[in-house]
């Protein structure tokens, strides 16, 4: 319809321009008073963002993105209305959100072998696990502060169990790792920013699984860990170190006994062999991911190649709820900060959002599906924005998503100079996304700049 329309500079024009009645809503710290605007249908994100900034009289401009019915506007209002069959008389409710600033590469740290897992959870450090069996810690200046030969086979997963500050200003941390060697391990590391080398100690090896261990995670208190394996089992463990072995060593031949005697004579400290507190049995194929829900750790979630997402009571070891998808072998999973939803990536090139509060056990509990051009191998959620997640894929692309807009990613970037090398792991903390893969480790600044 022809009407007086708002201009991008805050004035108005009487020219005969097709306009659409619009009201704006937001959940940000920049709300507008409720008011109906007549917006030219030729406008796109940039003009809408200018309007909101001028209406709010913001001293420092804040870029916004805009959503209609949960979908981010990528073109003009006219294009959106035409695609969705919306008439000129219909009032549009448009939600605005703060834009994701273009990701900026911070640094790159090559590794000799694939980086299968990366953690940004420890302030001022990045932790990596590699197919060469080593755990590594790097500071913000890219200095290698610790290198630990934790496993004799590729490491698949790591997590930070606990961290404490010592009197000499160093940090004592415990890292849990999982490996193709059928074990998981707890390793203690002292990180001193003033020391050229840092000490590590093998605390315990976790013995249960009969196939590669694919995932390990710790609860928030650092008192318990979970392991998941290709054997379909999930192990539930406490993080204490026993005084003696809880699992006997396998029988050794004469050659192995000689090697063991040499290690003892050289003073090598042997990790204690731990047994699980309980074993969770319900998956019918490989378990690819297991993690604790937020809180005290009474609840855990897992996903696997049997196309299921399962909820567990850690005290009883009972599977209390199962979401079954159709032919979706799951590779990775993350929980939203509120704990109400799970995001699971699959070999069918999708990431699916599941409502964990739903009582249904079938695919109808899926809220949205986010398609990728290549298999998304990993996913991590933002700690500060409940709507934003990051995925890494086998096409070598990292994608930043807003969960309210499933059609396309908010931003993308290609690590390792766009070489197309597979991304195997991502983590997101304090505005930094760590990316691990075939070419090593890269760190990218994503979102609001925060103190690292």
UniProtKB/Swiss-Prot annotation:
Q: Where in the cell is it found?
A: Nucleus, Nucleolus; Nucleus, Nucleoplasm
Q: Which GO terms describe its cellular component?
A: nucleolus; nucleoplasm; preribosome, large subunit precursor
The ranges of the WD repeats are 110-148, 150-195, 208-247, 282-322, 325-364, 371-411, 418-452
* MF annotations from Gene Ontology: ribonucleoprotein complex binding
The coiled-coil segments of this chain are none
State the residue spans of region: Disordered: 245-269
Where does the protein principally reside?
Answer: nucleus
Which SMART domains does the protein's record reference? WD40 (SM00320)
Spell out the Pfam families in the cross-references: NLE, WD40
Question: What InterPro entries does this protein map onto?
Answer: NLE (IPR012972), WD40/YVTN_repeat-like_dom_sf (IPR015943), WD40_repeat_CS (IPR019775), WD40_repeat_dom_sf (IPR036322), WD40_rpt (IPR001680), WDR12/Ytm1 (IPR028599)
- Compositional bias (Basic and acidic residues) at which positions? 252-269
Residue span of region Ubiquitin-like (UBL) domain: 17-98
**Keyword terms, alphabetized:** Nucleus, Repeat, Ribosome biogenesis, rRNA processing, WD repeat
Q: Name one GO biological process term.
A: maturation of LSU-rRNA from tricistronic rRNA transcript (SSU-rRNA, 5.8S rRNA, LSU-rRNA)
Q: What is known about its subunit structure? A: Component of the NOP7 complex, composed of ERB1, NOP7 and YTM1. The complex is held together by ERB1, which interacts with NOP7 via its N-terminal domain and with YTM1 via a high-affinity interaction between the seven-bladed beta-propeller domains of the 2 proteins. The NOP7 complex associates with the 66S pre-ribosome. Interacts (via UBL domain) with MDN1 (via VWFA/MIDAS domain).
Q: What does this protein do?
A: Component of the NOP7 complex, which is required for maturation of the 25S and 5.8S ribosomal RNAs and formation of the 60S ribosome.
> What family classification does the UniProt entry report for this protein?
Belongs to the WD repeat WDR12/YTM1 family.
The protein's name is Ribosome biogenesis protein YTM1
Query: Which organism's genome codes for this protein?
Result: Laccaria bicolor (strain S238N-H82 / ATCC MYA-4686) (Bicoloured deceiver)
Give the taxonomic lineage as stored in the record.
Answer: Eukaryota, Fungi, Dikarya, Basidiomycota, Agaricomycotina
Q: Which gene encodes it?
A: YTM1
